[in-house]
Swiss-Prot record:
Domain of life: Archaea
Temperature impact on function: Optimum temperature is higher than 90 degrees Celsius.
SUPFAM superfamilies: PLP-dependent transferases
PROSITE patterns: AA_TRANSFER_CLASS_3
Residues noted as binding pyridoxal 5'-phosphate in the record, renumbered to the chain: 124-125, 267, 321
Known role: Catalyzes the conversion of L-ornithine and 2-oxoglutarate to L-glutamate semialdehyde and L-glutamate. L-ornithine is the best substrate, but the enzyme also shows good activity toward L-lysine, and low activity toward D-ornithine, D-lysine, 5-aminovalerate, 6-aminohexanoate and GABA. The enzyme activity is specific for 2-oxoglutarate.
Protein name from the UniProt record: Ornithine aminotransferase
Residues with site note (Plays critical role in maintaining high affinity for the substrate): 93
Record Pfam families: Aminotran_3
Amino acid sequence: MELKPNVKEIPGPKARKVIEEHHKYMATTTNDPNEYFLVIERAEGVYWIDVDGNVLLDFSSGIGVMNVGLRNPKVIEAIKKQLDLVLHAAGTDYYNPYQVELAKKLVEIAPGDIERKVFLSNSGTEANEAALKIAKWSTNRKMFIAFIGAFHGRTHGTMSLTASKPVQRSRMFPTMPGVVHVPYPNPYRNPWGIDGYENPDELINRVIDYIEEYLFEHYVPAEEVAGIFFEPIQGEGGYVVPPKNFFKELKKLADKHGILLIDDEVQMGMGRTGRMWAIEHFDIVPDIVTVAKALGGGIPIGATIFRADLDFGVSGVHSNTFGGNTVAAAAALAVIEELQNGLIENAQKLEPLFRERLEEMKEKYEIIGDVRGLGLAWGVEFVKDRKTKEYATKERGEIVVEALKRGLALLGCGKSAIRLIPPLIISEEEAKMGLDIFEEAIKVVSERHGYKIH
């Protein structure tokens, strides 16, 4: 049966009961019963079906996890096959061929033609924690640079790198010492008021100069910095695409001072941007790459892929229990195969459709301040006023709700942006359908608040 968005009542009676019980028994995280009231029972292709039978087109990919589809048959087949062999083989103490096969594949597809090794874990946070330890151990340095707007995890180590929302650090000090944050080259919003679309080189120079002339000249000893953590496109910070040459200049700076470049591909890797890795758009080879989310196709897994010469070399410095889980490894291998069998090309093919439609919406609706993206990773930022760029956070939430009521699942990012990240299996027809619903939601909210529509 061919599915299409079909919503009768959301949240329906069954959903309301689940939401009520959830908040009674589950710890408070990021669930919002007023905005994200989707209670998922099952999935098919690019559609969620909720407990009341509502069908919703997914433009969230389960927060960037389900790139190869919400229930990919090849991934499910690989998982079932592995379940008949072995579920867990203690991969950091005993040996198993499944994790080795995955590590070989990750080294094969990693950016650049250099010798690498892999540490397997269960999440993006753990992948970044491993990167922290690899960088400290291999350089014998203790400091790091990260970017304002970044998200690298929520454990105490990675939380010290994260800087997208103050609430993520609230009552959590002290975090890991030695992390300094600098402005990300956001073409739309930056401390210098530079239009980074019109003057990308000026924006790049300001960020690089800030690191060289303010950090290194005044209070951060460059020779004590182990690594620079970055997202090639900031995710939780608002789906911010930096100027194309930024990472080339950052690499020059890093190489000059012997600093490792650590590329967090947790949200933007695995074909999301129309390349296997988002950093491939920027023509540099990072020293360490971290990946998770979409790697497992729904099964928890993380990986830290690093230059082989950075390896610990001493048993016991770092390890874990579930890293290299056999089922997760089987799922990840199936995901990579699916991506290489046309899904990355599909993201490339649909990029012009998203770019054109979203730019048209920006021209039409004054509430849209900025549109940015690559492949099937798009951010639309909403503002109260295009001149002041005042955040339209409340209106952003209303757009998410109106879309949900019409059968489109979205997620916010940044202070007032929405990310559009459908599974890479989405067809052109489904993409157009989702964009139509998105525009309808924008129109309804614009009319409600009196924003100009051209």
